[in-house]
Amino acid sequence: DSTTFLNSFYPSANDYHSLHEIDNFSWFNGGRNLFEETPLKINESKVFTLKNKTKASTGILTVAVTTGDYKSTIKVEANGRELGEIHIAPGDSFDKGYEIIRDYAVSNLQSVDSIRLTTISGGPTRLDYLAMTYPTPAPAPSLNTSFPTPEYVYNITNQDHHADDPVNMVIIIPTSQKLLQQAERLADFHRTHDNITVRIVPADELYNEFSSGTPDAMAYRRYMKMLYDRTTNAQTMPQSLLLFGDCVWDNRMNTNSCRLLNPDDYLLAYESENSFS
């Protein structure tokens, strides 16, 4: 029934938090940890708001701020009350960006809390995220209201890569398949000159079957692991994986340098969390 269904997921971790995070800037062209593009120059401030759905009067405010390769100080205020200052002192001359995360105990919370950040030295600085953690959860969602409807993106053709037999070489091409003809040329070369089996797979077909439709590099790995586990002899053992096409560090295409690119023309790259500097 509806009560059992609700109890299966409520309350969850998200019900105890309010978050402000915009990912559209990077200090360095690398990493998967992005920041908010709006710069706060010296003596400039910006007010951010966090909705308090829990109606709690106390909470823990987490502030994550970043700066370039220079010292900066950011003043933090909540609902007009100063909480403290965050000092960022770069240490490695090779790094392009630095981040400091601080927690503050906050009282007298409102239905909408205002967080003001002011750069009082150095700068410009940029926000990574603001998060408020509450001691009580937000009210349970009403199951009588309307729910979002799925968005139609495109028709998926019939496919069943879970039925694929092992091959010696897998070539993954971008979703747009603009490189299909060249990939076929390379595959034919290996079949003829190396006497190996080769399969060409568009990236989106792997996402649809191995990562629930979400562009995720783990789909590449899961597909190859399936072929490896399915192998029964050395002749059919997967030997090579070729990512045939360009990768780009900003897989979500959120930053200015990547925003105008077509994701379907690129394969996914792995970027670590701390590679932003």
Q: What residue ranges belong to the model's regions?
A:
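Structured catalytic cores of large enzymes
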Residues: 1-177, 181-182, 188-193, 209-277
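Short, well-structured beta-strand/strand-turn elements
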Residues: 194-207
